A protein has these predicted regions:
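Residues that define the loop-to-transmembrane-helix transition and helix capping
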Residues: 18, 42, 68-69, 112-115
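Structural signature of hydrophobic alpha-helical transmembrane segments
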Residues: 13-26, 75-80
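Helix-loop interface residues and adjacent transmembrane-helix termini in multi-pass membrane transporters
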Residues: 38, 65, 95-98
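Interfacial and helix-entry/exit segments of alpha-helical transmembrane bundles
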Residues: 21, 46-52, 56, 81-173, ...
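Alpha-helical transmembrane segments and their helix-entry boundary regions
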Residues: 8, 44-45, 67-71, 75
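Cytoplasmic/organellar membrane-interface segments at the starts of transmembrane helices
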Residues: 111-113, 177-264
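Single conserved hydrophobic/aromatic residue that forms the stacking wall/gate
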Residues: 1-6, 10
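C-terminal ends of transmembrane helices
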Residues: 29-46
Length: 264
């Protein structure tokens, strides 16, 4: 029963691959463009999640080991880096009760530790080599790029153009996240009066540092040594793709016949 269920699941997924791949690519670019018009920092990070998870879907529907491993790894990495960004935004809000970028800036002057964590997790979210996001994003793009019908081992219905268009989202992400960092961290200090009743220090407290530091260490570990986690994922990926070689060639042949009929 488990094998039949997997076959049904993968068969349905194979039939939907071109449409889902297109939607994922659109989501990557569209989510990045929406980020440009946001003045609320929390909304910007939330919409960036829409863009980032488009890579996750693209890798998942590449239906090959690289894409599937990258997609699962992306979910973990996204939870680390974006979760940390939400924590950092909340820590600023607790002090100044605003998330408006027009009212916040130059926070490195008063909050150097917060600023260091902010820059670090922005770089993690940007998939800078050496940090966790790079490996998963690279695998998702490689999976989509190499998933072509003429690939004998892992044929698929995506291809290079999906990866190329999704790659533009990486450029847009770098632009809006670096713009966000530049406005919040650097420049002249600007912020509403701090809430003295919050009981919080000007910069991060030891408790807040204790929350962020393990996330930062995980980002470094997964960026430098992802092989341990990827080996753990391999059995699940192999089981998921067990019926794939039987189903995809059939789907490719069906699409070729349909194209000939439509062409005739």
């Amino acid at each position: 029963p488990d094998r039949r269920q997997r076959q049904m699941c993968i068969r349905d997924r194979v039939e939907a691959v071109p449409a889902i791949g297109a939607l994922a690519t659109i989501g990557v670019v569209y989510g990045a463009l929406i980020c440009w018009v946001q003045e609320d920092v929390k909304k910007l990070v939330a919409y960036s999640s829409v863009s980032h998870l488009g890579f996750c879907v693209l890798g998942l529907f590449a239906l090959n080991p690289s894409g599937l491993q990258g997609s699962i790894l992306y979910m973990i990495n996204h939870g680390l880096s974006t979760g940390a960004l939400f924590l950092l935004i909340g820590m600023v809000y607790e002090r100044y009760h605003t998330r408006d970028m027009n009212r916040l800036g130059g926070l490195v002057a008063n909050m150097p530790i917060w600023s260091a964590f902010m820059v670090f997790f922005v770089l993690s979210s940007l998939a800078v080599p050496g940090l966790n996001g790079f490996v998963s994003e690279f695998l998702c793009l490689i999976g989509a790029f190499s998933a072509t019908p003429d690939n004998a081992q892992w044929p698929g219905l995506l291809g290079p153009w999906y990866a190329v268009f999704a790659g533009t989202g990486m450029i847009l992400a770098a632009m809006y996240l670096l713009y966000l960092t530049g406005r919040l961290v650097w420049g002249p200090f600007r912020a509403p009066p701090a809430d003295k009743n919050s009981g919080l220090p000007t910069d991060l407290s030891s408790r807040e540092i204790g929350l962020l530091l393990p996330l930062a260490l995980m980002c470094v570990w997964l960026g430098v040594q992802p092989s341990g986690l990827m080996r753990t994922l391999e059995p699940s990926v192999e089981r998921t793709l067990a019926a794939y070689p039987e189903l995809v060639p059939t789907q490719v042949e069906s699409m070729a016949v349909l194209e000939e009929v439509n062409g005739g």
